[in-house]
Each structure stands twice: as C-alpha cells, then as structure tokens.
C-alpha cells in the first residue's frame, strides 16, 4: 500500500478544521477525503460549485440546506446521515448546537484544490478558531470565486 502524503494534514477554513485523509494526488487527481470538525457557531453560507461532494455525519447535530427546486430549506442532520451535493446545486451548512460536529467529506479533486489553497495550516496543538475575522472571510471568498464557486444573494 502506498503511503499517503502527510504534509499539512490539518487546515482551517472559515473556522472549520479539515484533516486530509486522501489528497487528490493520492487518487490520480480524481477525489479527496477529509475529516472535518465544525465547532459551535461555524458554518458555510449558501454557495454552489461545479464539483460534487458528499458529507457523512459522524458526531453531533448539524443543519444543511440543499436547493430542491422550491428554494433552500434548512434540515437537521444527525450521526449516520449522508448529505449528497450534486454539481452546481446551491447548499450550505452550519452548527447551531453547543457541541462539535464531526463529519467525513468526499469531494472531486477540483474542490480539493480550493481546500489546498484556502486552508490555513494548523500546528499539532492548534484547533480551528471560533471567531473568523471579516478579512479572513473575504480572503476565502476571493479564493472560492477563483475556483468557480458562487455565492447567491440570500432570498
């Protein structure tokens, strides 16, 4: 079995910690697998991108919104639930509980490129910050746009 790359295993994006399990170069540039920890109050606003992704909820209770033709409605998800996001579908997620949410994320390699560029490396003793500055949000949004992501105006 080939040893996977372990360089910068953990990064933070918008207060969410991502730990690489498989990088795109480990899968012949096909897909990525990441473990995510989303602390209370963290989340990603409604957005869309050309890559498919899927979330498997491991621990905690999160809220996901996925466009369904009638709009965007938030739905509670729990351990064992899977949320599949087809390409170009508007979606968002958040943790409004008082406990961390842990999930497994599988995505196409193109989305992995975004995570590689936008992620801020975490040292062994660091964890994701609870509060994200406006400057950091703007930095991530600019990188997201460069990678084909769109953030529709709230309805």
Locations of regions flagged by a protein language model:
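Short acidic-glycine-tyrosine-enriched beta hairpin
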Residues: 26, 54, 69-87
């Amino acid at each position: 079995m080939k040893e996977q790359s372990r360089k910068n295993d953990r990064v933070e994006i918008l207060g969410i910690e991502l730990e690489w399990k498989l990088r795109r170069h480990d899968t012949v540039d096909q897909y990525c697998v990441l473990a995510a920890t989303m602390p209370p109050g963290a989340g990603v606003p409604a957005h869309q991108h050309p890559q498919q992704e899927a979330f498997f909820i491991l621990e905690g209770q999160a809220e996901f919104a996925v466009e369904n033709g009638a709009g965007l409605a938030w739905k509670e998800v729990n351990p064992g639930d899977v949320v599949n996001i087809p390409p170009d579908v508007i979606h968002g997620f958040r943790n409004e509980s008082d406990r961390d949410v842990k999930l497994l994320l599988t995505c196409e390699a193109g989305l992995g490129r975004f995570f590689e560029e936008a992620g801020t490396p975490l040292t062994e003793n660091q964890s994701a910050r609870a509060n994200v500055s406006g400057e950091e949000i703007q930095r991530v949004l600019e990188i997201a746009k460069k990678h084909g992501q769109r953030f529709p105006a709230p309805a």
